[in-house]
Amino acid sequence: MSVAGAPESTFDTVLVVDFGAQYAQLIARRVRECHVYSEIVPPTMPVEEMLAKKPKAIILSGGPSSVYADGAPQAPPGLFDTGVPILGICYGFQVMAQTLGGTVERTGRSEYGRTTINVATDSLLFHSLPQQQTVWMSHGDAVSQVPDGFTVTGQTADAPVAAMEHRDRALYGVQFHPEVVHTEHGRAVLQHFLYEAAGCRPTWTMVNIVEDQVARIRAQIGSKRAICGLSGGVDSAVAAALVQRAIGDRLTCVFVDHGLLRQGEAEQVEKDFVAATGASLKVVDAQERFLTALAGVTDPETKRKIIGREFIRVFEQAAREIVAEAGEGDEAVEFLVQGTLYPDVVESGGGNGTANIKSHHNVGGLPDDLQFTLVEPLRELFKDEVRRVGEELGLPAEMVWRHPFPGPGLAIRIVGEVTAERLEILRAADAIVREELTRAGLDRAIWQCPVVLLADVRSVGVQGDGRTYGHPIVLRPVTSEDAMTADWARVPYDVLATISNRITNEVPDINRVTLDITSKPPGTIEWE
């Protein structure tokens, strides 16, 4: 967790060993919801490296493999002899059992979905919980014999060993998934392991996170200056607010207004963010430049590349100006702040917290002579934690709870060429959708609601006494926790009716409103 030169973190650490299939991130989130810091590591990490992180506990995640299959991931040698409390979940439970001399086999009795389990209420994991409870299973293999010294603490109709423990060695295992919401006492099981078996302290709170990060940022940046590119999104805003609290006016934020934002967002960045943080802000009006570069382009990937290229060039020039101005005052600008989140770190294979900017995927392509050291104050946080940190820092709710918005902006929500006229049409429709969702109290229930203009499609309609040929608008409301998967949101019909009536009456050239009811997968959240 530490940055070179920064004070050691005061948080207890739980390592989640990732055996695949997206289970690890969910487990890590659930541990943090218990106010304990968690970090995901691969099963290939040597035990010595794990112990160097000073974990209070280790959790072995589920995974799609069979423990006895060739090439199946295993626990690193010596893991179960470290004395660190360990909880194995599903596949991790089976790895623990097999490694320590138990038996895992395919019994022919698989369990998928909700299952009733009978537990030993005098065991550490299940004390004070009902003897019979509902859990979520997802396994074909099963532990048929526990290792020596272990006690069976849970059974189902098809799994005679659904949980086990060796309390003297602080080793625990469950075949079910305590991290999923369908396991009715899953949080309690995790809390019993974290607080009682491992002695973890519930100190991973927003106040403590902010204090910890501010201290580490100050230690990293010292007396130097930093710059941050604001996109209008919550990640860059919270990252900038954290750094600004740490180093004050030695941070300069750059906001490139490419003209592709939604209604009122540019003004929100320029006014609300500065008012809330007092940060120094350099605004670059590049709307004409971006529209000129996008003229005649309809291919979505080409749009993305053009926008990325132009953004880099504009940001580069702004950065040069800031560096030059600082140089005149003998104050070097050595650091670039980015809003990288923990899922980005996990999916890219990790990182050491500081790297040269040209190697980072978020801002790749900056020229070689613009050398910065990265400051990534959010790289240990999930999205929901970032929002709570933003609230703790006093950022406006409209900014903190803003729906995710793509970097290329409205350009990839216009199916067809991007023009100033089409942007105005889409902005007006999008503003109505956001206003009505807010009025209905659905802001936080919906992950995001892209509004898509089918600019190259003409739809026949009747408005007034005449026939019209306008553009269709597509509403794409979805629910999600992390955008990896999503379901279409069941927005009440009366809200949809109000949105449709307002758009077709108030927005010129729109005569049809449609609803996208595709989940992800198979469809992505954005259309382009």
Swiss-Prot record:
For this record, an example GO cellular component is: cytosol
Keywords for this entry? ATP-binding, Glutamine amidotransferase, GMP biosynthesis, Ligase, Nucleotide-binding, Purine biosynthesis
Please state every residue range assigned to the domain named Glutamine amidotransferase type-1. 13-203
Gene Ontology molecular function:
ATP binding; GMP synthase activity
Ligase as a keyword?
yes
Q: Name the pathway it acts in.
A: Purine metabolism; GMP biosynthesis; GMP from XMP (L-Gln route): step 1/1
SUPFAM superfamilies assigned = Adenine nucleotide alpha hydrolases-like, Class I glutamine amidotransferase-like, GMP synthetase C-terminal dimerisation domain
Q: Which residues form the GMPS ATP-PPase domain?
A: 204-402
Sites binding ATP sit at 231-237
Annotated EC:
6.3.5.2
So where's the catalytic machinery, residue-wise? 90, 177, 179
Which Pfam families does the record match to this protein? GATase (PF00117), GMP_synt_C (PF00958), NAD_synthase (PF02540)
Question: What does it catalyze?
Answer: XMP + L-glutamine + ATP + H2O = GMP + L-glutamate + AMP + diphosphate + 2 H(+)
- Taxonomically, which superkingdom? Bacteria
State whether it acts alone or in a complex, and with which partners, per the record: Homodimer.
Reported function? Catalyzes the synthesis of GMP from XMP.
Extract the PANTHER family matched here: GMP SYNTHASE [GLUTAMINE-HYDROLYZING], GMP SYNTHASE-RELATED
* Cross-referenced HAMAP family: GMP_synthase (MF_00344)
State the protein's name. Answer: GMP synthase [glutamine-hydrolyzing]
What organism is recorded for this protein? Thermobifida fusca (strain YX)
